[in-house]
């Protein structure tokens, strides 16, 4: 559970959610979320699924972590970071494609330059937060 907890914590932090936000989405309380993130409890599947949905999860990653008999906290973090990086790349590619369709290339290039100037952690959080807003509005 420690690897799964680290995975969830990393994703939650990347998209800028507090434990209360996740708890509200999952129908539980922030103490329960804290215990899950620390790997202190083995939770029921429905609650875990609600939590991972709230932090923009990849269900295959959760299954992978459960199947690894000796998954570490670092394994969980690394898996979350790979998911965040994939989502970030995908979001940028999608944005560039949309801009090309609208013929707003110079405006887009300025925005891209501003994004490139951000440190990787801030960029990951910004894009993760943007993705979570998109997901909530669908």
UniProtKB/Swiss-Prot annotation:
Residues 17-38 bind DNA. GO terms for molecular function: DNA binding. Keywords: DNA-binding, Restriction system. One of its GO terms (biological process) is DNA restriction-modification system. SUPFAM superfamilies: lambda repressor-like DNA-binding domains. This is Uncharacterized 15.4 kDa protein in HgiDIIM 5'region. It comes from Herpetosiphon aurantiacus.
């Amino acid at each position: 559970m420690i690897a799964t907890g680290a995975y969830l914590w990393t994703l939650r932090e990347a998209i800028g959610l507090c434990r209360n936000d996740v708890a509200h989405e999952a129908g539980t309380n922030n103490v329960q979320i804290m215990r899950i993130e620390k790997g202190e409890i083995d939770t029921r599947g429905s609650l875990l699924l609600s939590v991972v949905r709230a932090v923009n999860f990849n269900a295959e990653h959760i299954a992978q972590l459960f199947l690894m008999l000796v998954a570490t906290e670092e394994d969980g973090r690394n898996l979350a970071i790979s998911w965040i990086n994939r989502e970030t790349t995908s979001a940028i590619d999608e944005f560039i494609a949309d801009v090309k369709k609208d013929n707003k290339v110079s405006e887009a290039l300025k925005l891209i330059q501003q994004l490139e100037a951000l440190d990787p952690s801030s960029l990951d959080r910004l894009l993760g937060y943007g993705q979570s807003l998109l997901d909530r509005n669908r």
